């Protein structure tokens, strides 16, 4: 889900190739507990790195969160990245996850929220606002990311939290 403007894919591919050439084995689509137990892995290896990322969205428990124009951040970022790699992405192509020409609001103050607002700017959204429940000084995301987003045209609305989605 990391946007290309933060980490270009060729850098990841180059680094992955170098690591593989140095003897590191990458095992993808592996399910601990199904493909092997954690104890089996511990017995077989000196060290184990589990880097799963956070792909389960936090639901906002307010009225209207089931409306058709509210999406989890990772769905949006993944679709945008895949499209950037040249993949066919139906939800992007049909306009569902493409923010071009749209008024966008992102709720949150972490780095994922900053990725969403900055990606929306790059997709030529009509406007982009970021709502965050605390003030700027207490945002969990990178201060540099906030400055970059502001310079790119994102409007921040501090001390704000939605009470209800209307449509």
Stretch-by-stretch model annotation:
Residues 10-59, 71, 75, 81-94, ...:
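A Rossmann-like FAD-binding core segment of flavoenzymes
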Residues 97-110:
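Beta1/beta-strand and adjacent pyrophosphate-binding region of the FAD-binding site
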Residues 1-6:
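Short glycine-enriched, charge-decorated loop/helix-capping segments at active-site entrances
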Residues 111-120:
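Short glycine/serine/threonine-rich phosphate/pyrophosphate-binding segments
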